[in-house]
């Protein structure tokens, strides 16, 4: 099983998403953050699950419209960004 590593930028994206949704519903923000984190962490079991976005970067659509971008190297899954699909 691979290990999942979060970049500081991906963690900042997760925080920004949670903060934005939290303006409207703190409970929904907490649930969305948990769903995104759980989906990213699940890549430890199936790292090739996401579609290829570039030659090395993969992406996993979690909860439309959010996309987790990551790459796999040396037994590690590097979570690079979590973006709204309109901002890709």
Curated annotation (Swiss-Prot):
The UniProt record lists the keyword GTP-binding: no
Gene3D superfamilies reported in the protein's UniProt record: RelE-like
Coiled coil: none
Effect of loss of the gene: No visible phenotype when deleted singly or as the relBE2 operon.
One Pfam match: ParE_toxin
Record's keyword terms, sorted: Toxin-antitoxin system
Function: Toxic component of a type II toxin-antitoxin (TA) system. Its toxic effect is neutralized by coexpression with cognate antitoxin RelB2 but no other ParD or RelB antitoxin.
Record-stated family: Belongs to the RelE toxin family.
Protein name, entry field: Toxin RelE2
Protein species of origin: Caulobacter vibrioides (strain ATCC 19089 / CIP 103742 / CB 15)
Highest classification ranks of the organism: Bacteria, Pseudomonadati, Pseudomonadota, Alphaproteobacteria, Caulobacterales
Gene responsible for this protein: relE2
């Amino acid at each position: 099983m691979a290990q999942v590593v979060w970049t500081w930028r991906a963690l900042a994206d997760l925080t920004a998403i949670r903060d934005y949704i939290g303006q409207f519903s703190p409970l929904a923000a907490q649930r969305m953050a948990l769903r995104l984190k759980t989906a990213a962490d699940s890549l430890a079991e199936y790292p090739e699950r996401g579609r290829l976005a570039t030659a090395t970067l993969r992406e996993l659509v979690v909860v439309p419209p959010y996309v987790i971008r990551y790459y796999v190297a040396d037994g590690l899954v590097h979570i690079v960004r979590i973006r709204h699909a309109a901002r890709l």
